[in-house]
Amino acid sequence: MSFQTTYGPDGRLRVAILGCTGSIGTQALDVCRQHADRLQVTALSVNSSTSELVAAAREFSVPAVAVADVAHGDDAVLQELPEGTEVGVGAQAVCELARRDDVDCVLVAIVGAAGLEASHAALISNKRLALANKESLVVGGDLLMPLAQPGQLIPVDSEHSAIYQCYLGENPREAHCIWLTCSGGPFFGRTRDELDHVTRADALAHPTWAMGAKITIDSATLMNKGLERIEALHLFGCDLDFINVVVQRQSKIHSMVEYADGSVMAHLGASDMRIPIQFAFSYPERWDTPAPRLDFRELGQLTFDAADMDTFRCLALAERAGKTGGTMPCVLNAANEVAVDAFLHDGCSFTDIDRVVESCMDAHDTQAVTSFEQLRDIDAWAREKAALVLAATHS
């Protein structure tokens, strides 16, 4: 039986946006502004950006908010929240928003592994899960996917939203393969030696997408595409070898599904995250676009290239983690988060990122995934190990 989404008394979808001040969260609020007759924001969370939280809560008259970072739970600006707004503090308070009776759909736009428990809370509370946090499935897909009813989890990543839509009305058993598209990042065509000398500013200059800092670096290393392959194998119930990566520099084809008869379904559109965000809210309907339309007369050419796994080692490491399975993707993800954070704070070089990740993976004894507690322990171990590798590299 397919999942049945609930709606508010006035027919609007009541939305919780977890991570409302990040790139995805702010674009989700744009969608809610455009479709105020169809969407009602009933819960918001931030990590520490309390001023922005208050501004959004006031604009949308939100009845409940949460601040994940306890150090900001007493920020004076929170006194300016609308009268009667409930305030929770800490990671569990964020999860409680996903369980509220006045929430129909939970957009998990929290960066990193912190989104896993919020995603779990949404699924077990019978909410539609609009999932923008790929780490939830990379780390905990073995635990989350058995909980998701058909149609309950709608991916927000542009590529996975594209694949999801290419499967609509089709028999998944007749699919031959998935073509997961990749922009190639800002360093497409560079050599490994050239990557040794790229700067933070170079890496943050993505050619086609406007994103947060962490995912922009992941896109530059191609770790983002590696994580997306692992996410796709959980979402679509296939092996990693079923999912091919192809570089599509213009980022206009968001992914493709090739079927047994040789037909290929491709999803095209503007490079604007508001489109997949809106689809996760509107499904099974389609609403007026929140973004400029694609004019094929002005598009020019579409190009396709193979991804270079020898130069972009993170893509190969993610493939290794995905094929190994178990707790290895958790280690991959945690070590990468630590290494990317170090790079963003000038604590390591660009190519140190994959070296740190590989060292942590080499040191890990893979286990079958059994619980969220186990994943928390593995995550903590990998972060500590990554910090030690970084310290040894730069001592």
Positions of PLM-derived features:
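Catalytic, metal-anchored helix/loop core of enzyme active sites in primary metabolism
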Residues: M1-S395
